[in-house]
């Protein structure tokens, strides 16, 4: 699902109908982005739509939105890989619920967001190892995994970890 396109339309043009459609068609995804990822406040705050819009008005984030939309104008390859990979996973783990997938732009916060039977892919975290903005914030080892080819493996990994958590995962050596 291309949540990112509605998000981009709202954040680059201020088109309030796009925000309304985000809230109507993707209420959980919108709440997760605004409240949990960006931590801008609650979705019911009277001024949340303006706060959300203003957060992304930074020129760096505006460029990131435009770059992500251009880089991921076509996601057929990723959709195909997700379908094949999660199909195989379903064969290996009978009864595993197939999540729904959506793309978003998350301001370089998290690469994959797991919801209740949904997987959000933050396209801004997969712009390629040589993406200029990444060089300011990430080392070469980190940037190596911030490519299109890591989207499907990351989706598999984080979805499985949400179902089968590992003890003390955050404190394990990489």
Where are these regions (language model features)?
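Acidic/His-rich structured neighborhood in mature extracellular/periplasmic domains
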Residues: 53-174
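N-terminal mature-domain "stem" immediately C-terminal to a signal peptide or N-terminal signal-anchor/transmembrane
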Residues: 1-55
């Amino acid at each position: 699902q291309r949540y990112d396109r509605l998000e981009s339309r709202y954040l680059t043009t201020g088109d309030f109908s796009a925000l309304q459609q985000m809230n109507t068609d993707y209420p959980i995804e919108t709440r997760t982005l605004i409240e949990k990822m960006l931590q801008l406040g609650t979705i019911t705050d009277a001024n949340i739509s303006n706060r959300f819009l203003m957060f992304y008005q930074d020129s760096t984030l505006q460029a990131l939105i435009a770059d992500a939309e251009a880089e991921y104008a076509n996601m057929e390859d990723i959709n195909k890989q997700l379908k094949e990979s999660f199909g195989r996973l379903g064969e290996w783990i009978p009864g595993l619920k197939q999540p729904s997938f959506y793309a978003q732009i998350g301001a370089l916060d998290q690469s994959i967001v797991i919801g209740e039977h949904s997987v959000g892919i933050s396209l801004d975290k997969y712009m390629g190892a040589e993406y200029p903005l990444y060089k300011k914030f990430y080392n070469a080892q980190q940037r190596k995994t911030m490519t299109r080819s890591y989207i499907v493996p990351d989706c598999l990994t984080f979805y499985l970890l949400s179902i089968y958590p590992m003890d003390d995962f955050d404190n394990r050596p990489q």
